[in-house]
A protein has these predicted regions:
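A short N-terminal helical cap/helix-turn-helix that marks the beginning
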Residues: 76, 83, 117-127
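AMP-binding/adenylate-forming catalytic core of the ANL superfamily
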Residues: 1-83, 89, 94-99
């Protein structure tokens, strides 16, 4: 069955916690995601939790991952089994035109993101 990653990405980015998302599942048993947390949400969340507002530090923090997982789970609750995002990791930086990860019309460049995050995607399927 084919899944529309754009539909799932669109639903993920409607969540206040998630600014950008790239969903991958080409010829794989399930979908995984590379996510960019919303910086405003992240700063507010970190302040309430008394944690640093730096994604590099927060990405490994269990409470932060759980908060993002809850956003993913909210979306998964509206999706069919094959559309659910099972695992995710965080992008190293937002997707932008300048880093060539987005087109001028603000669409993600899937082929570039797949290359940039090849190791993270592979790790999500291994783990």
């Amino acid at each position: 069955d084919n899944v529309s990653p754009q539909r799932v990405e669109g639903m993920l980015t409607l969540q206040p916690e998630i600014l950008q998302a790239m969903v991958y599942g080409d010829k794989r048993p399930h979908l995984v995601g590379i996510l960019v947390p919303d910086p405003e949400w992240m700063a507010e969340w970190a302040e309430v939790e008394g944690l640093p507002k730096d994604l590099k530090l927060l990405r490994e923090h269990e409470k932060f991952r759980t908060a993002i997982r809850e956003a993913v789970d909210r979306v998964n609750g509206q999706l069919s089994v094959i559309e659910k995002v099972r695992k995710f990791d965080f992008a190293d930086e937002p997707f932008t035109i300048e880093n060539e990860q987005m087109t001028p019309s603000m669409k993600i460049r899937r082929h570039i993101l797949r290359k940039v995050y090849e190791d993270k995607i592979a790790a999500l399927y291994k783990g």
